[in-house]
Amino acid sequence: MSALQTAFVSILSVLLVSVVLFAVYAVRGALLIRSSAADGGWIGRIGRTRDRDVQRWAFVAHRVTGMAIFAFLTLHIFDVALLAVSSSRFDNVHRLYGTAPMRVFESLLCMAILFHTFNGLRLVLLDVADVGVVTARRLLNGSVALTIVLGALTSVVILRPAI
């Protein structure tokens, strides 16, 4: 692995660690909100449906996938900018995209993009149209189902050359 590829993988690793740390921070915050006294504690949760918790986790997942997409786009801008510096350096870095670990990463990134897209469309629909709790739950289930189905299909396409 060349020095440029090592630098690219190092920066990608730092970005992935920052996304994971952000995810841990967001999940920790959601758990603290869930267990706080302001939320009514366990007594307050007795009469409440679980939809509110599911919506909160969808919100956390939306934030985490947004952070992951932003981190990748930032890195991708820099790796495409290498073309202005030297085409050999650009080709050197882009050889990494054909490796099996990067194909797995691209597959996960594609699933993050799908979830972020479908959940974002769901949130826009919830803001624009005053739908009820049942419809909101169905929309979330639909966005998760679409993410799983389309994510599996795209993963097969992305991972096939690496297998």
Regions found by a protein language model. Name each.
Residues 1-163:
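Membrane-embedded alpha-helical bundles that constitute the cytochrome b-like, heme-associated redox core
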